[in-house]
Amino acid sequence: MKLTWLGHSAFRLENGSAKILIDPFFTGNPGFAGQDGKSAAEGITHILLTHGHGDHVGDTVQLARETGATVLANADLAAWLSAKGVAKVDMGNTGGTVHFDGFSVTFTNALHSSAQITEDGVSHSLGNANGLMLHFEDGPAVYHMGDTDIFSDMKLINELHQPDIGLVPIGDRFTMGGAVAALACQRFFKFQNVIPCHYGSFPIIDQTPDKFVAGMEGAEARVHTPKAGDTLSF
């Protein structure tokens, strides 16, 4: 498996024939600046969205049109994407699992909101915010937490899904901060590898992973802090 952090909460994941983008926020993402959007989206088969905020939906509509990738989102967000002209949309909701060729995606809880704001400044709800649990027929299980705070049912997510790799938001203000995120990983999960995300993108969220790294001292999980654009192999 190859996993590339594309800044903020955006990741590219390759495993077998699956080439997946999660929350592809490219345009306007300072962490993506200087990266090649065509390379990041090359050959993608699926786009997975945790929720409807603009810094997660990102370039989904354009990328779906250009690549023909299937987009998976919660039911409300999926309907919105269809109205925007996305041809191949699949949907699910919290607790549900969607099966694709070689992998499956389960929608988990996340403590956050999900909406798009129209030009008149009105916020329109687009279903629940979710985490995404990816299981592969051959490869490690990956849990993208989405945007969330800590919650005790994370213990059940670990019990049910036993994720190997955690993609963990740590930026504070809109998600849990680094120290709390480390507590979540240490108390509720048995990750082998963790990658912090949703930090350093904008001035109002934490700029470094230092608090998370410090909180993970002594953990069995290996903490990776790649630069945006770096690829890790598992």
Curated annotation (Swiss-Prot):
Transmembrane segments: none annotated. The keyword Mitochondrion does not apply. InterPro entries: Metallo-B-lactamas (IPR001279), RibonucZ/Hydroxyglut_hydro (IPR036866), UPF0173 (IPR022877), UPF0173_UPF0282_UlaG_hydrolase (IPR050114). Keywords: Hydrolase. SMART domains: Lactamase_B. SUPFAM superfamilies: Metallo-hydrolase/oxidoreductase. GO terms for molecular function: hydrolase activity. Belongs to the UPF0173 family. This is UPF0173 metal-dependent hydrolase Atu1317. It comes from Agrobacterium fabrum (strain C58 / ATCC 33970).
